[in-house]
Amino acid sequence: QVIVDRHGEVLAHEKRMLLAPVQITIQDACRFVSNLGGLFIPAHVNREAFGLLPRLGSVPPDLEVEFLEITRNANKDTLLQKYPQLAEYHLLKNGDVHYLEDFLGALEFYAQGSSLAAIRDGLISIL
């Protein structure tokens, strides 16, 4: 995989294979991120290949998350019909960017500080 700048110029190459299974549960990953002071947001949850919803049929009830990321072309209403439990979450729409032309742009929001709570509240305010 290559790392590029905003002009598409190659800055570096990543030699490690980044698409590989891990030996921890999603719940453990969530706890790990939370313990580091982060906000755990499962990505591409509706994606047919490796997505949480197509693989498990639902979000695990013991997964303590508020946000889920859905794919760029997802229709929110269609997803809510297929997976009604998604109404319990704040849904972010982002892109799985492999090429610069696929980049959707920045997700901008205002936070009342730099704490995790302020960032969380800022995200909620734009959804």
Regions found by a protein language model. Give the residues of each.
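Charged catalytic cores and adjacent phosphate/nucleic-acid-binding surfaces used
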Residues: 17-18, 31, 36-39, 46-127
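Non-catalytic interface/targeting segments
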Residues: 22-26
